[in-house]
Amino acid sequence: FDAIIHLAGKAHDTKNQSAAQSYFDINTGLTQKIFDFFLESSAKKFIFFSSVKAAADSVVGDMLTEDVIPAPVGPYGESKIRAEEYIKEHFAFPTASSCECSPFREMTSVTEKQVYILRPCMIHGPGNKGNLNLLYNVVKKGIPWPLGDFENRRSFTSIDNLCYVIEGLLTKEVPTGIYHMGDDEALSTNELIAIMCEAMGKQPHIWKMNKGFMEGCAGLGTLLHLPLNTERLRKLTENYVVSNAKIKAALGID
């Protein structure tokens, strides 16, 4: 085989019911075993699905780039960055100070292997089971969206764009590195609701309920284990814009 794509892992738990160690056992421990296998195998390329949450739980400034110093919050992001660190400890990744005489360059050329750490933001497409599925069910059932008072911008990754990037990494000569992944345009949650309604031929019902009231409801939802809790409210209403400039440049995408 020519490549290994490692996308198995434990997803972020919006209900906060999973034991922290389970994230490290799966997202870190499993990655270590698979990467060790890759290094001993004849495969030339390794693609590891990390997450933007390994870089930052929230975005400071206009957008999140690969230059950020990772500061994950919680076991999901922490387990992902731990896996990234293991990969970088066992394979020569380019650095800002790399040059032609760098031993990192020599090691990479000798092994003739390439390693890609992908950090996609929230992925959307058929079969989505996360917060986007919650939004879909809200629209499908005709339930009014009560969070219209929250104005935000958030990056998403379509499954089609993600597959296109994977194909590019497998078929083109792309340098080893860390790459963020997101669609070109960031959307607000309200815009996303409107798009879903249009796709299903429904009228959007977006209510601008008081922010403080909705935050209180989310807090109650955390205590009662309801679908809308504090963590889910934050994820649905926060600003989280991710730059895709590096991966587009690497693949020659205008």
Model region roles, listed by residue range:
Residues 74, 113-134:
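Flexible, glycine-rich beta-alpha linker
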Residues 128-134, 148-170, 176-177:
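Substrate-positioning beta->alpha
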Residues 187, 205, 228-254:
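C-terminal amphipathic/interface module of NAD(P)-dependent oxidoreductases
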Residues 71-94, 110-116:
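Active-site Tyr-X1-5-Lys
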